[in-house]
Amino acid sequence: MASTDERTLMLDDESDYDIRCQQLRQDNAALLGDFSRWLKKAGLGAATIRSHCTNLDFYLNHFLLYADTLTPADGVCYVGEFLGDWFIHKAMWSNKTTVKANAASLKKFYAFMAERELIKPEEFASLKQQIKDKLPDWLGAVERYNDPEVDFEDVWPI
């Protein structure tokens, strides 16, 4: 059993985590507002903007805050993990279409981040290359994951 000091430390850590998440969610909301305006200025329609922002809200406020408190800039390194694994497992609506849509949303979002110099140009270039190279693998993974005839261990061996 954990000592009183250990339990207090865990509560403090949890409280710090919750406070950090709350702050990041506020920052993310402001960033998504800026992103939405950027998309509108680029000529995208309201439904498309809403779709991109919904996809990004899930990525920013669920995936990046799931086990850690990662900023959107930190998250550029985790897009592959999100699209190729986490999204497929955690989003009950995951399918080939939604993986492609999320890839497009993330690509646009990180283009916006790069334009604003919130990430380095080489990080954005690496992200685009990763999406280009890995998208077929991610689509295959989601197809296998959603196929009741496929053994789960064949998709993600333990």
Locate each region found by the language model.
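Charge-rich, intrinsically disordered N-terminal extensions
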Residues: 1-119, 125-158
